[in-house]
Amino acid sequence: MYVRLTLADVNEGEMDNALEYVKNKVIPSYDGISGLLGIAACATNDGRFMAWSTWANEEAKEASIDKFNQALAGAAEMLDGQPEVMEGPMVLDNNISQYPRKAKMDFLQDSF
């Protein structure tokens, strides 16, 4: 498995808009993307925006990076500067991986 993590400073008053953008634009744009396991975003305890996507492998992430960049381009006006991107191999607890993707996404959608 592979993860891409993005941290960004958000312009004052734009955090809710940034989270709504991910919920309403970014997540739906990835529906049906091969190798994508999930996308999520949150506000951190220090006021930064954090988003992550999990992939079956690095190749799946690389195959959709252009679409990812296009989807995030609309959020640029909400950000204060360039986001910090980190990525690499990850491990996952078997408990979460046993749930169907649809069930996990319904849970995450309800949390916004």
Where are these regions (language model features)?
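Short S/T/G/P-rich N-terminal loop/turn motif that feeds into the first structured element of a domain
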Residues: 1-50, 56-70, 76-112
